[in-house]
């Protein structure tokens, strides 16, 4: 949770030790009480729900948890900071949570299937975190925009899926096959 909290604050790939960057970018900007009450407690609660596919709500919990299953099957956790921040900030809006997690799963799938490197992934999620910070009151009626795939990304995703899936690395190939199988 500390690593993801650091990422939410810094929005960049880690360059120094976690301790150094946490002190520099997090502890210098919030009080200890704020850190615990406003960040660590809600972020930890969100992390547990995301990692264990245990989102609870009166509506859409099963759908959200199904999407979380696939997010957790990706070969990285770069998607986790925006998911933690979003869930911590919108815990009682299950409609918007479903919309967000569905879009996030599509973005994470795109990044995995098209074999984007860690720098591209971190940069892509950075812009989502920047928008989340600048628009904390976003709603389903006026949702976050940076979570959407661009036209170029959609085209690249489609071309990759239309390509030679069986020559891909096992991680990418198996993810695609299992994900397609889940729709049947």
Model-derived regions, located:
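A cross-family structural signal marking well-folded subdomains
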Residues: 1-183
């Amino acid at each position: 949770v500390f690593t993801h909290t650091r990422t939410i604050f810094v929005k960049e790939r880690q360059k120094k030790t976690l301790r150094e960057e946490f002190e520099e970018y997090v502890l210098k900007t919030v009080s200890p009480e704020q850190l615990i009450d406003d960040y660590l407690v809600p972020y930890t609660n969100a992390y547990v729900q995301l990692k264990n596919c245990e989102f609870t709500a009166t509506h859409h919990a099963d759908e959200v948890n199904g999407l979380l299953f696939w997010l957790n099957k990706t070969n990285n956790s770069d998607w986790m900071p925006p998911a933690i921040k979003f869930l911590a900030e919108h815990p009682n809006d299950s409609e918007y949570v479903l919309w967000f997690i569905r879009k996030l799963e599509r973005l994470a799938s795109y990044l995995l299937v098209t074999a984007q490197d860690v720098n591209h992934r971190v940069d892509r999620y950075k812009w989502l975190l920047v928008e989340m910070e600048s628009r904390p009151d976003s709603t389903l009626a006026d949702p976050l925009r940076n979570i959407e795939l661009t036209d170029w990304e959609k085209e690249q995703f489609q071309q990759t899926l239309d390509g030679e899936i069986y020559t891909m690395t096992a991680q990418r190939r198996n993810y695609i096959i299992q994900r397609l199988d889940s729709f049947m």
